[in-house]
């Protein structure tokens, strides 16, 4: 029997394991980004939403609730919020169907609709049920309404006898959130709706992605959208970094729970994951394949700088954004986001021969 050389056997095993041999760099990008970034990020949101739904149900079933119980439930909410922030920037696939993102988060809330509509729903004549919630405004259906219930005036009522209607809303919203997370995950999963397969298999018979550039372009547009949203909506407008210069901390994301900085940090980590595909052959590797090692390294360094600047911000953005040290970090973050946007809007598409859609260039 002929024995294969050890080196060849090893390489063959690697090829079978990675299912990458024979694939073009673009195909490898789609495979790696899907399996190592898109699907795991949705799976994390699903898991965290389930933890929150189960914990909320247990919390509201208690005859008496303590501040310790409330603190533990808040931690579960933070976990679900973190899971959502991981996929918040994605602008293709199931999340854009039927206002799924609005069902999870209503923000920015310029008119305090979350508080007003939540109070109306809780104090209304209709029983607080899942169908009633799902037929009501998206403002009160997801994480944003839950944040109000857990961190604003209703939080005290949750610990008293009069708090049951608020707890009913809290528990129902958590169940609804889990249903949305499950819908998103199942629609992506190969054994469900398999949108992952749709994105990973561009071609003339694929109406959504007729060629590889269309599929990769959707990924780049997501990166542009996510970076632009951090820069404009999470920094410039609430902190007065735009031309007007007037800060309004109530426009910050998650200002009630003081999770604004943490949300940005998770955004950046997930966007970097979408760029690199972790250890896989992501967009970062494709640039190297196109002899753009310098550009690839520059973008990686910019992500690292943005993450470092965000992590160095002390305290909450709503209360401490004017402190000198924090202002310096915020300015560094703001500048770095601008450099990242320039790379993803112009340099990378030009290198890959990809034309981005109108929305990805909005704000130029």
Regions found by a protein language model. Give the residues of each.
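Mature extracytoplasmic or organellar-lumen-exposed domains after removal of signal/transit peptides
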Residues: 24-364
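Bacterial N-terminal signal peptides that target proteins for export
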Residues: 1-10
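C-terminal motif of bacterial Sec signal peptides marking the signal peptidase cleavage site
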Residues: 18-20
């Amino acid at each position: 029997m002929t024995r294969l050389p050890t080196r060849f056997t090893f390489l063959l095993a690697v090829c079978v394991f990675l299912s990458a041999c024979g694939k073009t760099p673009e195909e490898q990008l789609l495979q790696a980004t899907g399996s190592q970034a898109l699907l795991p990020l949705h799976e994390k949101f699903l898991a965290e939403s389930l933890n929150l739904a189960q914990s909320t149900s247990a919390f509201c079933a208690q005859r008496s609730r303590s501040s310790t119980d409330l603190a533990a439930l808040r931690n579960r909410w933070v976990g679900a919020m973190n899971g959502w922030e991981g996929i918040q920037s994605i602008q293709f696939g199931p999340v854009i169907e039927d206002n799924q993102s609005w069902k999870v988060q209503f923000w920015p809330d310029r008119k305090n609709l979350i508080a007003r509509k939540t109070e109306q729903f809780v104090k209304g004549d209709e029983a607080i049920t899942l169908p009633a919630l799902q037929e009501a405004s998206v403002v009160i259906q997801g994480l944003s309404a839950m944040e109000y219930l857990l961190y604003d005036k209703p939080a005290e009522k949750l610990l008293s006898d009069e708090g049951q209607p608020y707890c009913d809303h809290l528990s129902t919203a958590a169940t609804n959130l889990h249903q949305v997370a499950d819908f998103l995950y199942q629609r992506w999963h190969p054994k469900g709706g398999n949108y992952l397969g749709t994105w990973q298999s561009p071609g003339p018979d694929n109406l959504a992605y007729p060629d590889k550039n269309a599929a990769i372009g959707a990924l780049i547009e997501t990166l542009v959208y996510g970076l632009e949203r951090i820069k404009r909506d999470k920094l410039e407008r609430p902190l007065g970094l735009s031309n007007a210069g007037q800060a309004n901390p109530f426009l910050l994301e998650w200002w009630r729970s003081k999770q604004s900085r943490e949300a940005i940090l998770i955004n950046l980590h997930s966007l970097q994951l979408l760029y690199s595909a972790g250890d896989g052959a992501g967009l970062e590797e494709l640039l190297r394949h196109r002899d753009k090692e310098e550009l690839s390294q520059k973008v990686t360094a910019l992500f690292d700088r943005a993450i470092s600047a965000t992590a160095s911000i002390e305290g909450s953005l709503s209360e401490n954004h004017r402190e000198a040290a924090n202002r310096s970090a915020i300015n560094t973050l703001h500048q770095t986001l601008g450099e990242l946007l320039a790379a993803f809007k112009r340099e990378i598409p030009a290198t890959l021969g990809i034309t981005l859609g109108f929305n990805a260039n909005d704000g130029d």
